[in-house]
Amino acid sequence: MPTSQSTSHGTPVTAPAPATTAAPGPVRDYRADLTLFMVIAFAVSWLCWGAAIALGGTETNEAANAPYLLGAFGPLVGALVLRIRRRRRGEPVPAHVVRFRPALLLKALLLLVLGSATVLAGALLASRAGGPELSLDVAKDAVKDVGGPAAFLVGMLVSGPLSEEPGWRGTAYPRLREKLGTLQVCLVLGVTWAVWHLPLFFIDGTVQHDLGLATPSGVLFVVSNIPMAMLVTAAYERAGVVASIAVHFAVNTTMILLAVEEPKVQAMILGIQSLTVTALLLTHRTGRRRP
């Protein structure tokens, strides 16, 4: 309560109340959300991919194509379940969600170019260092094998970027960021992403199966999930999930067109992406966002 004092003329003067500062909002605990998301993402993906493995793989049995493709949508299914659950409960959007706005479209396009450039630069440098030569014939064959440019681009967009990014970046990332720093979240999601991909090494007909898990190329693929997670996270922080989808699409598409399989090329790309994300993360600061 305010206190009263007297002036020299005896007139009471009310002293101002002490200033108060608003307490910071409580840090929400998203462990239940994250557990539910991870269980759904892994269960949907691994059950589908397990079925593809049991059917003999996509190389020898066309029936394996459906579960193989459906497996990629585990993270998206998890994201949709959490979104519906949050709305039904009337819960607020997590503080670290980055909403996409039309004004950010140019930034997303620039990040798409950057993502592709990290792969192209790595392949060119590896070629100069004695690695495999780049060939347009490989790219032409990759596009032709799936029925032309339109089918190729749609397939590359859906099977990976669209099926994964709303989950890993749009759902898991903001909730992990509530208690962890950006770099810590990148490491957590990078390792999680690498583990999530492991069944693909056992599906005949996949890129991962061709690489082989117990080979330098397979090991480098697994390790590359960490700088890749950092790269798409840096894109997400700047322009939302549309940007992370764009970067994921650009990297995957460029790697397929260039047939990146040699360890020397993979290592060079991994190094360039690591340097790129270091620069991106160091030059970007994020506060707590509220919708």
Regions from the language model: what does each represent?
Residues 120-128, 164-165, 182-204:
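Transmembrane alpha-helix/helix-exit interface in multi-pass inner-membrane proteins
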Residues 210-272:
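Functionally important transmembrane alpha-helices
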Residues 2-3, 18-161, 189, 256-291:
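Specific transmembrane helices
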Residues 34-38, 108, 171, 185-186, ...:
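Alpha-helical transmembrane segments and their helix-entry boundary regions
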Residues 163-190, 236-240:
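Membrane-interface helix/loop boundary segments of multi-pass membrane proteins
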Residues 121, 172, 228-232:
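Hydrophobic/aromatic residues in alpha-helical transmembrane segments
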Residues 167, 171-174, 202-213:
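Membrane-interface interhelical connector segments
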